Amino acid sequence: MVIMTRLLLPFTHGIDVSAITRALALAHNLGATLVVLSLIRLPQRPDRGPRWEDIQQSNDFLEFVQHKAARSGVLVERVELYTHHPVGSIRALSQEMECAGIVLVVRRGTGVLLATHEVKQLLEDQRLSLYIVPLLAEASMFSLPRWLSHWFRGR
């Protein structure tokens, strides 16, 4: 019987190349499948839908991680959720998918891929198994045009 190890990488905003690269390296080193969870926040008002920019960023994130994972030989499972409560959804999905842990990326005490307050809420929950990935101070923000030009050249 093969035991599949899963690590959950949650995302709410701010595509960061170095964060994604480090999460993929962690999954590779542990022989784990990376469950890539993109959370799209729903507005509190029921007559409003999610922002188009949030949906587009979610799609970009999932595609970018899929591409990087394929190049590094890491298995990924993509999940996109629309939610009013991102942290609660992270907890629930981690348990539902039997993830060995949740990958949280930070830079200088600030959340990366998640808002800082979301990272803090997850850190406060002692029931969760967490993998904290610290990044160096310099930022490596995602540039869709640059990524697309590299991707098309590589095909």
Tell me the role of every PLM-derived stretch.
Residues 35-37, 77-82, 131-133:
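General small-molecule cofactor/ligand-binding pocket signal
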Residues 38-61, 141-154:
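Acidic, proline/glycine-rich short linear motifs
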Residues 16, 58, 83-84, 112:
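A conditional alpha-helix N-cap/helix-loop micro-motif detector
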Residues 1, 71-102, 107-110, 120, ...:
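Structural beta-alpha unit
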Residues 103-126, 137-142:
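Glycine-rich, Arg-bearing micro-motifs that act as flexible, cationic patches
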Residues 23, 65, 90:
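Aromatic/hydrophobic pocket-lining residues that form π-stacking "cages" and hydrophobic walls in ligand
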Residues 27, 65-69, 94:
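Conserved hydrophobic residues forming the short capping helix/wall of the S-adenosyl-L-methionine
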Residues 2-50, 72, 125, 135:
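Small/aliphatic-rich secondary-structure junction motif
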